[in-house]
C-alpha cells in the first residue's frame, strides 16, 4: 500500500472504457470498500498471476499497467529493506512470512492505515442519492464528508466507494490527499 501511495496509479483508462475500469477497480476491492486495500488486493492477485505465467492477461483484463506494477513491486522491496534495516521486520524480502504475519487481519491493517495517514481522516456527513445513470437501474450516490480543514468534501470519482451505493460499514474514511477541482475530492 505504501508503495502505491508514492507512485502513479497502475490503472490504464482507455477512452470510452471508463465504466469498465471503474467496475474492475470495484471488483478488485472485493468487500473491503477501500481504495487502499484494493491496491493490496491488486498486488496479491498480480503476484499470483506472475507465478502462474498469466500476468499479462490479468493486467489486460483489469486494465492494469504491468510496467507500473513492476515499479511498485520494486518500491515495495525497497520499503521492506528499510524496515528490515530498522529491525521492524525479520526479513528484507517483503514476501517472507515474518514480514506478513498480520496481513490477513483486515481490522489491524485498517487501523495501521488510519494511524499512518492520520490526520487525513474524514467523517461521512451525508449520502445523497442521485438519479439513475447510464440507462441502468443503478443509482450513484454523492458522498459528502467532512475533514479537519474542509466541511464539504466529496469522494474522488475514481474511488471504489463511488459504486458502494451508499452502503458503508463505517462512517469514517482515511485519505492520502485532497484534490480541488470544481469540487474538493
Where are these regions (language model features)?
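Second RecA-like catalytic domain
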Residues: 1-185
Amino acid at each position: 500500500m505504501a508503495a502505491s501511495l508514492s507512485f502513479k496509479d497502475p490503472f490504464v483508462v482507455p477512452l470510452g472504457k471508463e465504466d469498465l475500469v471503474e467496475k474492475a477497480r470495484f471488483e478488485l476491492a472485493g468487500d473491503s470498500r477501500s481504495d487502499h486495500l484494493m491496491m493490496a488486493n491488486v498486488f496479491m492477485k498480480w503476484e499470483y498471476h506472475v507465478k502462474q505465467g498469466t500476468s499479462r492477461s490479468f493486467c489486460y483484463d483489469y486494465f492494469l499497467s504491468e510496467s507500473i506494477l513492476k515499479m511498485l513491486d520494486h518500491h515495495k522491496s525497497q520499503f521492506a529493506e528499510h524496515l528490515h534495516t530498522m529491525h521492524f521486520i525479520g526479513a528484507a524480502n517483503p514476501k517472507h512470512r515474518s514480514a506478513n504475519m498480520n496481513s490477513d487481519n483486515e481490522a489491524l491493517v485498517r487501523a495501521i492505515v488510519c494511524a499512518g495517514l492520520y490526520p487525513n481522516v474524514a467523517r461521512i456527513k451525508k449520502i445523497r442519492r442521485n438519479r439513475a445513470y447510464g440507462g441502468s437501474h443503478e443509482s450513484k450516490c454523492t458522498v459528502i464528508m467532512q475533514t479537519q480543514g474542509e466541511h464539504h468534501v466529496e469522494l474522488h470519482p475514481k474511488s471504489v466507494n463511488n459504486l458502494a451505493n451508499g452502503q458503508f460499514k463505517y462512517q469514517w474514511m482515511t485519505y492520502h490527499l485532497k484534490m480541488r477541482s470544481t469540487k474538493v475530492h
